[in-house]
Structure formats: structure tokens, C-alpha cells
Amino acid sequence: MNNAVFVIAAYLLGSISFGILVSKAFGLPDPRTVGSGNPGATNVLRSGKKLAALLTLLGDAAKGWLPVWLAQYYALPVGVVCWVAVAVFLGHLYPVFYRFKGGKGVATALGVLLAFSPLLAGLALLSWIVVFALTRFSSLAALTAAALAPGFAWLLLPQIGYIIVVFVLSLLLIWRHRSNIRKLLDGSEAGFGKKS
């Protein structure tokens, strides 16, 4: 497969919103119209359907993992693998199928990290779990994991290109949480289980 086609395919895969599709399949409201307005697993969970949230999480993570893993499996150049990783993540943030209005990228970023290194993904996930357990703020948990991920990548990944990608994904994820950052600072952010 042509490298450019691989990158484009990764973007299109990233543009598929499992939060929207799963919610529709379960007869739930469009997650963009309720709660935080984010079509991610945490907001789908606010509907009360744990299975729907789990499927959203797995779908969004899998679409981040699959194209990167395939690019590595077919021994594409590291530079191409990096572009594939960025493309699938941008597809989730700015999906062509939903007028370029997507999610915040937490699960998809985790999928990319998993393809790079299971240990890296595990450390990022552990960071999220610890902060969420202590604070009940999924946004703060995501921001903490994003802030720590480049450091983990620096220690674990041998390819500088992959480290740069993790840094870029972390910056984009933090940027997508800018409204949450403002709410955290002024005390108006709703913890999980409370209305946004």
C-alpha cells in the first residue's frame, strides 16, 4: 500500500466516532448533546449504560492501535508510522464525517501508545486511574497522563520519532481540554457522577 494512502486511511479510521455509533445502537442520546458534549467513553458512561461506555472506550482505543500496529507489522519506515499515528489521532479530534468536530482523544491516544509500547500505555493508564480515583475528575486524570506520557516515552522508546509523536499527541490532548482546565482552575469542573 502506498504510504500516503496508509496515512489517509488512518485519518479516515480515526474519524469514526464509536461514542456516537454505540450510543445510536443502544438507543441513547447523541453524546454531543448531553453531559460534557464530548463523544467519548466517560460522557457515554453518564448515560448509565456501562456496556455502551466500555464499547466506546474499546472502539476508540482500537482505532488508535490498529493502523499504527499495521504500519509497524508491514515494516513501514518509522517516519510513516509516526504520520499514521498523528493522522489517526487527528481523525478523532477533527473527523471528516462529523464536520471536523470530534472528541478529546484520550482513548485513541492510549491506543497509539499501546502500539508503540504496552508498558508505555500501561504507565499512562495507571496515571489516569490513580488521579481519577483520588479526584473523580476524568479531565484532570487525562491531563496528568498526557503531561507524564512524554517523560515515559523518553525513558522507554528507542525511536526519537515516536517520542516526538507522543509529545505532539500530549500537547494536542491538553489543548482539547482547555475548557476543562479553565473550569478546574475556577472550581466549576464537575466531578464524575455530577452534572456538567
UniProtKB/Swiss-Prot annotation:
Pfam families: G3P_acyltransf. It catalyses: an acyl phosphate + sn-glycerol 3-phosphate = a 1-acyl-sn-glycero-3-phosphate + phosphate. The chain crosses the membrane at residues 3-23, 78-98, 112-132, 154-174. Its EC number is 2.3.1.275. GO terms for cellular component: plasma membrane. Disulfide bonds: none annotated. SMART domains: G3P_acyltransf (SM01207). The keyword Transmembrane helix applies. GO terms for biological process: phospholipid biosynthetic process. Keywords: Cell inner membrane, Cell membrane, Lipid biosynthesis, Lipid metabolism, Membrane, Phospholipid biosynthesis, Phospholipid metabolism, Transferase, Transmembrane, Transmembrane helix. It is found in: Cell inner membrane. It is a multi-pass membrane protein. Pathway: Lipid metabolism; phospholipid metabolism. It is an enzyme of class 2 (transferase). GO terms for molecular function: acyl-phosphate glycerol-3-phosphate acyltransferase activity. NCBIfam families: glycerol-3-phosphate 1-O-acyltransferase PlsY (TIGR00023). Probably interacts with PlsX. Belongs to the PlsY family. PANTHER family: GLYCEROL-3-PHOSPHATE ACYLTRANSFERASE-RELATED, INNER MEMBRANE PROTEIN YGIH. Catalyzes the transfer of an acyl group from acyl-phosphate (acyl-PO(4)) to glycerol-3-phosphate (G3P) to form lysophosphatidic acid (LPA). This enzyme utilizes acyl-phosphate as fatty acyl donor, but not acyl-CoA or acyl-ACP. HAMAP family: PlsY (MF_01043). This is Glycerol-3-phosphate acyltransferase. It comes from Methylobacillus flagellatus (strain ATCC 51484 / DSM 6875 / VKM B-1610 / KT). The lineage of its organism: Bacteria, Pseudomonadati, Pseudomonadota, Betaproteobacteria, Nitrosomonadales. The gene is plsY.
